[in-house]
Amino acid sequence: MITAEKKKKNKFLPNFDKQSIYSLRFDEMQNWLVEQGQQKFRAKQIFEWLYQKRVDSIDEMTNLSKDLRQLLKDNFTVTTLTTVVKQESKDGTIKFLFELQDGYTIETVLMRHDYGNSVCVTTQVGCRIGCTFCASTLGGLKRNLEAGEIVSQVLTVQKALDATEERVSQIVIMGIGEPFENYDEMMGFLRIVNDDNSLNIGARHITVSTSGIIPRIYDFADEDIQINFAVSLHAAKDEVRSRLMPINRAYNVEKLIEAIQYYQEKTNRRVTFEYGLFGGVNDQLEHARELAHLIKGLNCHVNLIPVNHVPERNYVKTAKNDIFKFEKELKRLGINATIRREQGSDIDAACGQLRAKERQVETR
């Protein structure tokens, strides 16, 4: 639930008259109902309407009294996202351009795998981290999303899947924005979708990725939640990483590894390192050796990502043969590594390509 204190703390949150009903955890809904003089068990009914029947309005909750429905409408909105554009890739990946209630736009991606359907969600409108290879950061940060707006992305995709009786089985928090810069709303989202009373998506089927906001890595390590954790690394040396990711000037590689060691001591969980390969920048065998030396001894996996084309950026994709050589060298040095399957690059839905492109074109 978004309180006045939360808004004061998070200056990039929207200032809507009513908050999204999807921003409430089940226990928060129970507590709110009791505070309003209502019966606690109504929370179960409300969540069934929201997450199982997936209604679009409070008026559709017909087993609630008219007075309770009015009370809910007076205090909350059922956040609905307007689908501006829906594009499907030749590999089955679907990208949604959603419009929020204040007119801003975000992108969300549905990826189909043999093991199920995965949704890549966005946590911010824009991004201020400034990675020099990424489209998401080109327009800067506009605002943070409420937890309910992140939940709504998953629900809207799930509604699209209902027609074919499919379900969202995995969530990756790797869309537009830096999740750890919207930490409280991200954690609220995680606890909501993981709850048995809502979408009931298992913690080990959810992955959150960060560019390396070190104070929040320590916070995340202290959370009692078994979410998968990934770190965008992209280089083992500060000089190269700072060129790719200016955030490294504030949180350098040495401090980042220390934070990851703390995370593993607290959680005993594996970390995934995301390593984008940029032609002539970080893709040589010497870079593989530097990476192996840096992370040796950590319980980790390296996800090698061929760079995706962004018109405003000058990076080029590493040759396929060099990608295989890089992977082979890591494995020779005892590092668990795989090459990420490319999905959605033909519709600008792949890693580093997400932004509100269509809406920007329309409003010029």
UniProtKB/Swiss-Prot annotation:
Specifically methylates position 2 of adenine 2503 in 23S rRNA and position 2 of adenine 37 in tRNAs. Confers resistance to some classes of antibiotics. Reaction proceeds by a ping-pong mechanism involving intermediate methylation of a conserved cysteine residue. This is Probable dual-specificity RNA methyltransferase RlmN. Its main location: cytoplasm. The keyword Kinase does not apply. Keywords: 4Fe-4S, Antibiotic resistance, Cytoplasm, Disulfide bond, Iron, Iron-sulfur, Metal-binding, Methyltransferase, rRNA processing, S-adenosyl-L-methionine, Transferase, tRNA processing. It is found in: Cytoplasm. Its cofactor is [4Fe-4S] cluster. One of its GO terms (cellular component) is cytoplasm. Its EC number is 2.1.1.192. NCBIfam families: rRNA_mod_RlmN. It catalyses: adenosine(2503) in 23S rRNA + 2 reduced [2Fe-2S]-[ferredoxin] + 2 S-adenosyl-L-methionine = 2-methyladenosine(2503) in 23S rRNA + 5'-deoxyadenosine + L-methionine + 2 oxidized [2Fe-2S]-[ferredoxin] + S-adenosyl-L-homocysteine; adenosine(37) in tRNA + 2 reduced [2Fe-2S]-[ferredoxin] + 2 S-adenosyl-L-methionine = 2-methyladenosine(37) in tRNA + 5'-deoxyadenosine + L-methionine + 2 oxidized [2Fe-2S]-[ferredoxin] + S-adenosyl-L-homocysteine. Disulfide bonds join 120-351. The keyword Lipid metabolism does not apply. [4Fe-4S] cluster binds at residues 127, 131, 134. InterPro entries: Aldolase_TIM, Methyltransferase_A, RlmN_N, RNA_MTrfase_RlmN, rRNA_lsu_MTrfase_RlmN/Cfr, rSAM. It comes from Staphylococcus aureus (strain bovine RF122 / ET3-1). PANTHER family: 23S RRNA METHYLTRANSFERASE, RADICAL SAM CORE DOMAIN-CONTAINING PROTEIN. The active site is at 107 (proton acceptor), 351 (s-methylcysteine intermediate). Belongs to the radical SAM superfamily. RlmN family.
